[in-house]
């Protein structure tokens, strides 16, 4: 299946970053950051990106989004956008659309880093084939990881900013109770 040209996206609660890749060996081009608040939905942001850069329709797209992906329907946690992955694929006339959690995408890229690009935290010597954690702040708190599995790694998805907290005292319990009333945690 031909997957080029393709659109690549990193969608957060505040910004949507898009890039174009014309072929497998081509560098990323037309890199642009759009404010999510300026568009009704992800389809409108993508169409504005394509039109604004004079690009034709992509054949495929890969999007990392700051949200759990548990099925076809995506309802963003930190923004008002919601969409069906299948309907977005049809609307954009894509042969293939892959939507995954943004930090899962970052975790899957970790094996591509060179030794010089990595920083070890703690310990004396790196442990080969050990689990790897990834943590980063954006509009929310992204977390992910990689778990070794034979010759491969398996990504572990998570939403660090949406975890249930354990209270250590009455004051913390009261704060968590208020948060729970508003957000359901």
Regions found by a protein language model. Name each.
Residues 2-52, 154-162:
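Short glycine-rich, Thr/Ser-proximal phosphate-binding strand/loop in the N-terminal lobe
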